[in-house]
């Protein structure tokens, strides 16, 4: 059995840190129609988490679409028992088991797709990856769920119907965000153009793409003609222009003052 998988380790997921990498695994599951997105958690935590901290780490991943866990631990040792033997761990296991089971019964609900610029990163322009991180942090901070899509997904998996992109989970995207990138593969760009023609919303957020590429970046490229009626936001901030390019939110969580929490 093959599952989209990520590891959750202390430098990456901990209270007061921001890292949305679980979205890589869950997006693959959603786009390709896999019921589970797997995480091996707690493998390299040199400071043993408390139960509230462990629950935070699980919740952080579940919110981002992870719905299957393996807790990495050693059941015994020569010196002392591991932290997973502490009181209350049984309850945390039961909570994780129940929550992830419920998640597996439903269908993913994100209506926004974020293009991941693999082709551009291959050329050594790694700044675009940092721009993507900034953009998705802005989305999550403003409670906008999303999935990553790639050139391969656009070419092989996503289908068009009435201005919506459907994946193999029968989930559909109404808006596609194209963050900073230089290249987009030709067939993928043609799918994006057709999505726009059918009424889908496209937001170019950051630096706009310049070229399509085929099998070569040297002699198989063509200039991209950007649509006039798409949405454009050069700043890596969540602006009203960004909001206008996105579907209406179905659920918004607010604090006691009626404001979206930071």
Question: For the regions a protein language model found, what residue spans apply to each?
Answer:
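Carbohydrate-binding surfaces of carbohydrate-active enzymes
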Residues: 1-262
